[in-house]
Amino acid sequence: MAPVQALLFDVFGTVVDWRSGVAREAAPFLARHGIAADAHAFADAWRRRYDPAMAAIRSGARPFTRLDILHRENLLAVLAEHGLAPESAPAAEIDALSRAWHRLDPWPDSVAGLTRLKARHIIAPLSNGNVALLLNMAKRAGLPWDAILGAEVAQAYKPQPEAYLRTAEILGLAPGACMMVAAHNGDLAAARTVGLRTAFIARPAEHGPGQTKDLAATGPWDVVARDFLDLADQLERLQEPHVLPA
């Protein structure tokens, strides 16, 4: 394999367990406001609005808007679906819950795996999250990124080509010197189309026990790994010696 200098990571679902974290944050809010909903189902309903909220931005119908703002808008819509009018809850409570995405826990292998990978490669998120969200998450979870490049840096949301290409450009690297690491086959397909290398990491619990999508690699990815530690093992075998740029 040709040298890979930077590993660029999808975050929600690949590095952190968004579903459990959002459910944990939502549960006391729902109880406090008398909303009889399962916290994990509530998290799923909130997450289902994630991609549609970005569609208007990708199409150009709406100017680029940070994910924190989209998350808050989506939260208000989901709360309304559950019978809670926005004005009936203190704005501070809504704000705190909308930032649940800043406080997500890493998968058990994430920190140790990233630390190993960092020794040989530049590691950075390539996420639809905004800089403040990713920074707060990293500080809380101990994610050892070399750089934090939120979507507002590229002014594009995956799977737009600009999201991948501008990230590589900002790092001063050709697309082929970067590897996209994700638990989502669609993300990898978009990255591969614009010249990035690809690594699939299975996260079969991302969507809970009923998950049916992305249980296995479905494309010709460069690496398929069980977790980040396995990814480190495979890259160490494939790429000797160290390939960090001078």
Task: Give residue spans per PLM region.
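Asp-based, Mg2+/Mn2+-dependent phosphohydrolase catalytic module
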Residues: 1-4, 85, 111, 115, ...
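Short, acidic loop-to-helix structural element flanking the phosphoryl-transfer center
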Residues: 64-69, 84-124, 161
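Active-site neighborhood of HAD-like aspartate-dependent phosphohydrolases
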Residues: 1-48, 81
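Generic structural signal for small/hydrophobic residues in well-ordered secondary structure
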Residues: 10-13, 75, 125, 191
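Tryptophan-centric aromatic hotspots in well-structured domains and transmembrane helices
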Residues: 18, 104-107, 145
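Hydrophobic alpha-helical core bundles mediating ligand binding, dimerization, or RNAP-core interactions
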Residues: 22-30, 46-50, 71-72, 94-101, ...
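A metal-dependent, Asp-based hydrolase signature
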Residues: 34, 40-43, 48-95
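Alpha-helical elements of Rossmann-like donor-binding domains used by nucleotide-donor carbohydrate transfer enzymes
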Residues: 24-28, 45, 73-77, 96, ...
